[in-house]
């Protein structure tokens, strides 16, 4: 499989159907839980630690599913969905680098929210800086992440961990 450096929505949906990395390997969730529309850049080099970087975007639209229910008359994207997108991207990175197994979020260090995504926003950008990729019995990625809305940073998460598992029976 040839590695691409960017992915469009249809390619991300293909990953969600298990077609991109093969059966039993890393998959993205399908909508509505897929929290980005495109990966604009992915590389095993670069980033703040020289271990890789992922950049992705979500187009904000007033009719996104969560605005209707979170909250009544006070629509805001749930912070946990932005955090989940960061884990989704690290899992994608692990599959993209050839890691076997299904992705599972394993934890986070410090998470900070200092802004919000409102229906009036235009674009969310996620930036993940990989700190470490372990390619042993457990295939695991650790990264620091930032979420920007219309160019302003509003979330950060340190030491996000995602593992790939070939068997999740005892997980």
Swiss-Prot record:
Catalyzed reaction equations: a (3R)-hydroxyacyl-[ACP] = a (2E)-enoyl-[ACP] + H2O; (3R)-hydroxydecanoyl-[ACP] = (2E)-decenoyl-[ACP] + H2O; (2E)-decenoyl-[ACP] = (3Z)-decenoyl-[ACP]
Location of the active site: 70
Location(s) in or outside the cell: Cytoplasm
Assembly mode: Homodimer.
Pathway: Lipid metabolism; fatty acid biosynthesis
Name by which UniProt lists this protein: 3-hydroxydecanoyl-[acyl-carrier-protein] dehydratase
Family, similarity comment: Belongs to the thioester dehydratase family. FabA subfamily.
NCBIfam families per UniProt: fabA (TIGR01749), PRK05174.1 (NF003509)
GO terms classed as biological process: unsaturated fatty acid biosynthetic process
Alphabetized UniProt keyword annotations: Cytoplasm, Fatty acid biosynthesis, Fatty acid metabolism, Isomerase, Lipid biosynthesis, Lipid metabolism, Lyase
UniProt-listed InterPro entries: FabA, FabA_FabZ, HotDog_dom_sf
GO MF, one example: trans-2-decenoyl-acyl-carrier-protein isomerase activity
Organism of origin: Hydrogenovibrio crunogenus (strain DSM 25203 / XCL-2)
Enzyme Commission number: 4.2.1.59, 5.3.3.14
Role of this protein: Necessary for the introduction of cis unsaturation into fatty acids. Catalyzes the dehydration of (3R)-3-hydroxydecanoyl-ACP to E-(2)-decenoyl-ACP and then its isomerization to Z-(3)-decenoyl-ACP. Can catalyze the dehydratase reaction for beta-hydroxyacyl-ACPs with saturated chain lengths up to 16:0, being most active on intermediate chain length.
GO cellular component, one term: cytoplasm
CDD domains xref list: FabA (cd01287)
Pfam families reported in the protein's UniProt record: FabA
